[in-house]
Amino acid sequence: MLRISRDTKIVARVTHVTKSRTYATSTAPKLVVGLEIHTQLLTKRKLFSSTTVPSLSTTPNTKVSYFDAALPGTQPRLNPQALLLALKAAIALRCDVKELTAFDRKHYFYPDQPAGYQITQHRKPLAINGKLKLNWWDLYSQNEWPALLAKEANTDSADTRDLASRSIDVPILQIQLEQDTGKSTYHGSETLVDLNRTNMPLIEIVTAPVIHTASHAAAFVKKLQTLLKRIGVSTGEFESGAMRVDVNVSIGEDGERCEIKNLPNTSSIEAAIEAEYNRQVELVGKGGTVEKSTMGFDGKKTFILRSKENAVDYRYMPDPELPLIRLSKGTLLKVRDSLPELPDKVFSRLTDDPYYVTTKDALTLIHVAGLSDYYFEVFERVSEETEDAKALKQPVNWVVNELLGRVRKADEARAAESAESGEPDLGAHDYNSIYPPAKLAELILAVHNHQLTLPSARLLFQHFLANPEDLKNMTIEQAITEFELGESGDVVDACRQVINEHESVVKSVKDGSKPGSIKFLIGMVMKATQGRINPAVIERQLKTEMRHM
């Protein structure tokens, strides 16, 4: 890494003093929050050079072009893929995309910005005036859902409101395309600089300061993550640095705002907002003033890092090496047509006829990239073979509980190994490759048609996940024969053994004193056969054996 002594002084040029404000304390001030969200785009190359994007495990300073390092004579060349992804985000967020957009230089001096300026968009951003809708299921925790739904069902209640009315629209002021900076790491008196991240493509999404609770701010970020993953613009991961969030907090509509930088997750976003609000209220309550500042957050409290610079300090100027970009209506239509079905529409489809997925499962399918499309295909294949309502409920159970559950357990195991080796393994999954939808539908139908019991199907599913070659080459019928999973003749031996071991129970069933006790006998046979045999088959065989006693 590049090494810079901490003794080196890097001083920002201050040309304007921010005015402080004092607030009346007769009533508790309103919390006002705005968000600035930086999201890395899923491109193969950097924003203004042909360098391929690095991974988390890439050796420091090995993915750096001459332009990334700001060597004299190098010039930027826009990556069109980054522009298209930024347009997808802007359209999905219902923004007005500008016909003309341009790049500016934002000047400041810092070790991880070798050019002395960042290429961003200040005067002519890519898009403005968007919005993101937060529905009731976005705004309320799952623990609150039962009470909300019960209240909604109680039409006699005077204060009952349609759940749809609980949604809010968060305005988006602008979306701009810009380059990322390098990464600084501090060790004692030295600063280590890794330029791999320099010139990575970002979009900055700026909301209006209209959010009034910390939980709503976190809900906005979660919803945005889901949307960007759904349309293939970004992974939205905090862990890998693909998303970084700054929050602006003030008290009262005219309050001076303080910016909290680079919060690492949604829990920290909530906690930092609440801590900063309490700090400002306490400060004003003691007769102090809130000054425009950049804040840090240590997990419990916020603290002042530096006085906030005004925009004039950055000395914005048009980038003379990048031309204006003119976007045609045809280009925007093509981008719009390339968008997949957006999360809110997918949710509405999942919870309606013929799927009737629960709210909880619908959100799981939406939040996990690629999983809702996978579910739809499994459902369609099952529904082609049967209209049985019970069978049609099985695809969501298998996709959410069995497939996703086992994939997540495998991820946790790999993450633990990666933590030990220092090489994190992050990223989305291709569920079609892990377990093809046709194969899962075949397994579900085998249970429905009594070829397999549910425990046997789960065992077979687990085997196929661990042995992809068997999954690829073996049919369900072959697997039933190979692993002796069918309703084989050993049911006779198992039934006879259970009857001999539980004579008193058998007697109570036969004489009619306790006919329900046959369920106990069925359970014992299922235990003896490891759940491989259908309970109905076991019951028939038990009754046959008892008749011949």
From Swiss-Prot:
The keyword Nucleotide-binding applies. It is an enzyme of class 6 (ligase). One of its GO terms (molecular function) is glutaminyl-tRNA synthase (glutamine-hydrolyzing) activity. It is found in: Mitochondrion. Its EC number is 6.3.5.-. Residues 1-23 form a transit peptide. The keyword Flavoprotein does not apply. HAMAP family: GatB. PANTHER family: GLUTAMYL-TRNA GLN AMIDOTRANSFERASE SUBUNIT B MITOCHONDRIAL AND PROKARYOTIC PET112-RELATED (PTHR11659), GLUTAMYL-TRNA(GLN) AMIDOTRANSFERASE SUBUNIT B, MITOCHONDRIAL (PTHR11659:SF0). This is Glutamyl-tRNA(Gln) amidotransferase subunit B, mitochondrial. The lineage of its organism: Eukaryota, Fungi, Dikarya, Ascomycota, Saccharomycotina. The gene is PET112.
